[in-house]
């Protein structure tokens, strides 16, 4: 919940999260159903949407459990399902037809034809593959019948999202089952080289300097990867992207804060600008924590607002009589005047 609060308090319009099963970050501290209810209430009172990630491949023997997950989440009021498995798309439409379906980046949709096919299946938003250059994103946005979302900040896979089998082959932990062991972040040696090189580790993506261009393309939503990051990271990155998206120019202080809170020897825009190569690679370096930056980030979500409570108002009006106004919250507390 701290990371969720950090996102909301720093300007997120929507948050995406997962339950303990059926999501691509099963190693994270995911939400229970009770915590999901708390998250939905917290976000909806503040005008923020909750998107539930069910973004792995699901086997036949798991479909009953997945169906129950979809049903309960819909009852709790989630605003969208983020889905990879085509079978789950049909299941979501059957069980919760009023909840929008977003095609996960794990679907590897990288062309207009893929977007059109997803739209035919009933998907209302497509999260494009991270590897697309700006020209192809713009072309898809101009011709897409559904909303387009792209990742603008966070970790990049060495392989195309949803198409990597390295973790499964090396450690029997499939990335398409939410269990990626991140072997691309490990050192590898070969020949006369010692095992001190990281030939598969990409720097994190950072497109903060391109936000106005991305908006002009018609991208409906920008996405920040942060589900296994500290709340302070979520706070800092969300705050900066919100400010720039609202029209403030990017500053050197912004770029410094983004790099300080987490980076892998800087950032890359290689896929977006179409300049792939050796400059995209880097590793995370342990550096002393910036105490002022971390303290400010924590304060933004720990002391960012007065508590809010969702309430319902009732008016009782009778001709020739006094009027009554009643208010009640979702826990049964109320007042009348």
What are the language-model segments listed below?
Residues 3, 87-88:
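Alpha-helix capping/helix-boundary segments
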Residues 5-9, 14-21, 40, 46-56, ...:
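Surface-exposed amphipathic alpha-helical tracts and adjacent flexible/coil segments at the periphery
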Residues 25-44:
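Glycine-rich, positively charged N-terminal anion/phosphate-binding segment
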Residues 90-93:
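Short active-site loop/helix that positions an aromatic residue
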Residues 96-98:
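Conserved phosphotransfer cores of two-component systems
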Residues 112-113:
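Conserved nucleotide-cofactor-binding alpha/beta core module
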């Amino acid at each position: 919940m701290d990371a969720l609060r950090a996102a909301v308090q720093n300007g997120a319009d929507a948050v995406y999260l997962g339950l303990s099963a059926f999501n691509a970050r099963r190693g994270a501290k995911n939400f229970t159903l009770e915590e999901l209810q708390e998250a939905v209430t917290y976000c909806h009172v503040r005008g923020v949407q909750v998107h539930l990630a069910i973004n792995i491949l699901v086997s036949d023997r798991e479909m009953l459990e997945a169906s129950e997950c979809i049903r309960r989440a819909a009852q709790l009021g989630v605003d969208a399902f983020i889905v990879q498995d085509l079978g789950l798309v049909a299941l979501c439409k059957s069980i919760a037809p009023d909840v929008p379906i977003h095609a996960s980046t794990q679907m590897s949709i990288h062309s207009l034809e893929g977007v059109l096919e997803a739209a035919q299946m009933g998907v209302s938003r497509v999260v494009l593959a991270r590897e697309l250059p700006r020209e192809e994103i713009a072309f898809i946005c101009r011709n897409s019948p559904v909303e387009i979302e792209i990742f603008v900040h966070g970790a990049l896979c060495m392989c195309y999202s949803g198409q990597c089998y390295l973790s499964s082959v090396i450690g029997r932990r499939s990335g398409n089952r939410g269990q990626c062991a991140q072997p691309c972040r490990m050192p590898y040696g070969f020949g006369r080289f010692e095992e001190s090189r990281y030939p598969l580790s990409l720097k994190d993506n950072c497109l903060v300097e391109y936000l106005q261009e991305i908006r002009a393309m018609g991208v409906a939503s920008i996405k920040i990867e942060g589900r296994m990051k500290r709340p302070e990271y979520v706070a800092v990155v969300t705050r900066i992207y919100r400010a720039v998206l609202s029209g403030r120019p990017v500053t050197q202080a912004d770029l410094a804060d983004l790099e300080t809170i987490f980076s892998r020897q800087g950032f890359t825009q290689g896929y977006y600008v179409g300049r792939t190569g050796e400059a995209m690679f880097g590793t995370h370096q342990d550096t002393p924590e910036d105490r002022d930056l971390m303290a400010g980030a924590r304060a933004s979500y720990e002391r960012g607002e007065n508590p809010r409570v969702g309430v319902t108002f009732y008016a009782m009006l009778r001709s020739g009589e006094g009027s009554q106004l009643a208010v009640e919250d979702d826990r049964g507390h109320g007042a009348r005047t």
